[in-house]
Each structure stands twice: as structure tokens, then as C-alpha cells.
């Protein structure tokens, strides 16, 4: 398969994830994983996952984008633009799908909008995913992949997303990431 079409694989998986949610096929898996992660709660883990969540937050990326604009590195500015595009896509999809978040009784952070797909997961995949593709040092690549995973996991731990929300966010952003990486002149 040509690399320029690789984006279709995670896109198709995202669509499948959406339909599994819509028709409540994945609901029991979502609740199983949700409660499994919820049972890990302790003060240290809560502090740790709040930090992880902050590294995937909109405010973190706003500050990052402004810093990149000030530094005027053209390639870095594009990372910021991609993050903004992903956040826009996320808001539109959430407004269309309107999946409620898990019950507020489990929330360790305040969230008011809809659940699917996870915006933190989408931003992490783009922001850190571009680094994974660009960086030559393999140890840094592994660290960034772990950060992406931890940001997604943090959203389940903090009680504001289901597993399928996080997976959906990862898949949609991975699709976008592969599309821009293999189909634009910025990265080829």
C-alpha cells in the first residue's frame, strides 16, 4: 500500500468506533475499562494523571502555538496550525455526535462539553505524533509515544472519558497525522 493512503486505515477504524458507540456495541467494554482504571485511584496517581492531562489541554497548546509563532520557525508554526485544525474538528464532531460524558460523580476535573472523541487524545496524537515522525533519536520517539498513551489514559482515570472516546480521538488524529505527513510538501 502506498504511504499516501495509510491515513485511510485509522480513518476507517474511527468510523467503526463511532458506529460501535452509536449502536452501544462497545458499551460493556467501555464500562469495564472505565471501572478498571477508576479502581487505581490514589493521591499520587491523581496528581500524576492531572499533570498528564494538562500536557494535552487546550491551554497548553495555546501557549505552545503562541511560543512557536514568536520563534517564527515555519515548520513549528505548522504544528500549531495542525493543532488548531484538530481542535476545530473535535468541537464539530462532539457537537454532531453529542455523546454524554461518564457520570459526574466520577469526574476528578471539570468538563462541560461532550465526550466523543477525546480532544486531549486528538491533540496529543498531533502534537507529539509529529515529533515521533520527525525525531531521529529512537529513545525520544518512545518517550513521546508513552506521553501520548498517558494523556489518553489520564482522561479515563480522571473520569471524563470512556475508552472508546480516547481510542476515537487517537484514530482520527492519527489519520490526519498520516495524511499531512505523507501528502503535503511540509513533511515529504
Would you name each region that the model predicts?
Residues 1-60, 94-108:
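N-terminal transmembrane-helix/juxtamembrane module of multi-pass inner/ER membrane proteins
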Residues 5-9, 49, 74-82, 140-146, ...:
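Alpha-helical transmembrane segments of integral membrane proteins
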Residues 13-18, 85-92, 146-160:
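Aromatic-anchored segments of alpha-helical transmembrane domains
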Residues 39-50, 71, 75, 109, ...:
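Membrane-helix interfacial "entry" motifs
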Residues 47, 85-92, 167, 173:
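Membrane helix-loop-helix hairpins that form the core translocation module of multi-pass transporters
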Residues 59, 69-138:
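Membrane-interface loops
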Residues 64-71, 149, 170-171:
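Hydrophobic transmembrane alpha-helices of multi-pass, membrane-embedded glycosylation machinery
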Residues 107-188:
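Membrane-embedded catalytic cores of phosphoryl/pyrophosphoryl-handling enzymes
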Amino acid at each position: 500500500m502506498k504511504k499516501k493512503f495509510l491515513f485511510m486505515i485509522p480513518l476507517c477504524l474511527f468510523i467503526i468506533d463511532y458506529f460501535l458507540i452509536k449502536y452501544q456495541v462497545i458499551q460493556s467494554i467501555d464500562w469495564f475499562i472505565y471501572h478498571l482504571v477508576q479502581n487505581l485511584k490514589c493521591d499520587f496517581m491523581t496528581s500524576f494523571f492531572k499533570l498528564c492531562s494538562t500536557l494535552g489541554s487546550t491551554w497548553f497548546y495555546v501557549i505552545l502555538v503562541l511560543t512557536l509563532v514568536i520563534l517564527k520557525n515555519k515548520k513549528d508554526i505548522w504544528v500549531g496550525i495542525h493543532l488548531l485544525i484538530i481542535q476545530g474538528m473535535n468541537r464539530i464532531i462532539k457537537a454532531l455526535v453529542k455523546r454524554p460524558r461518564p457520570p459526574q460523580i466520577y469526574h476528578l476535573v471539570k468538563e462541560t462539553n461532550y465526550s466523543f472523541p477525546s480532544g486531549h487524545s486528538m491533540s496529543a496524537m498531533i502534537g507529539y505524533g509529529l515529533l515521533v515522525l520527525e525525531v531521529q533519536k529512537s529513545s525520544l520517539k518512545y518517550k513521546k509515544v508513552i506521553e501520548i498513551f498517558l494523556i489518553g489514559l489520564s482522561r479515563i482515570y480522571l473520569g471524563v472519558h470512556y475508552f472508546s472516546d480516547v481510542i476515537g480521538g487517537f484514530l482520527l488524529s492519527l489519520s490526519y497525522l498520516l495524511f499531512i505527513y505523507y501528502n503535503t510538501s511540509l513533511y515529504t
